[in-house]
Amino acid sequence: MAGKSVAGVFLYLTGIAVLFGIGVTPASAVIIRGIDFPAGNLSFMDELVSYSPKGVGIPTAPHRDPFTSLGPPDFNGDNNCTDNLSCTFVSLGSGGSIILQFTDNSLTGSGDSARDLHVFEIGPDIEDTFVDISKDGVDWFAIGKVLGSTASIDIDRFGFGPTDFFYFVRLTDDPNEGDITGIQVGADIDAVGAITSGPPPTITTTTATSTAPPSVAEPATILLLGAGLVGCALTKARRRE
């Protein structure tokens, strides 16, 4: 009897904990190269949508791994890497582009003049990059360009705010800036992160994976909560016996 009572209490408390978010560890903020990312490592791009290097001299193979632009910045200081393992960034080529996607967060406006999006671009050459953002991967909004090296953009300046959520970022090298030949032609992208981060996608888009809205419990959560409440009821019933 005692064992069953303890089990019931455990299930009940587990259900309550899930319902109210008790015991859920929030994302830990990180500061990278002087930039504060309140959502921590969740702030950075998660998936590659497309990569189209261009130019008179397309970047050499070690500089054409687009997956190196995902996740937090990890540039190791080697601008002249000779193999994929040592290259921690991707070169776009002169006029080339890359489209990246958030899956566990989104980019949103802060409601003020604070910077919302940060692009980590590396290399000794100044290479400007046009930046576009999209909610669905189809309709794009231009939000200016970053002027070489690392730079931040305030998307509120372009009419967006805290109720706008973007899941795609497109970076396009400005062919009129920087070298047009060499082994790492075009902007060299290490990472892209949302300083002002919002919830993950809640609807199905052209390439995004649908997830449950943050305010709605998923089926597994509902079952766990139900089990907890049943356990509580059984415990009370046995106490009456």
Give short role names for the model-derived ranges.
Residues 24-29:
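Sec/Tat signal peptide C-region and signal peptidase I cleavage site
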Residues 237-241:
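Short, charged juxtamembrane terminal tails flanking transmembrane helices
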Residues 215-235:
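A short, hydrophobic C-terminal helix/tail in secreted or cell-surface proteins
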Residues 2-13:
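Bacterial N-terminal signal peptides that target proteins for export
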Residues 30-200:
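A domain-level signal for the mature, folded cores of soluble proteins
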Residues 12-21:
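Bacterial N-terminal signal peptides
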Residues 203-211:
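Extracellular mucin-like PTS domains
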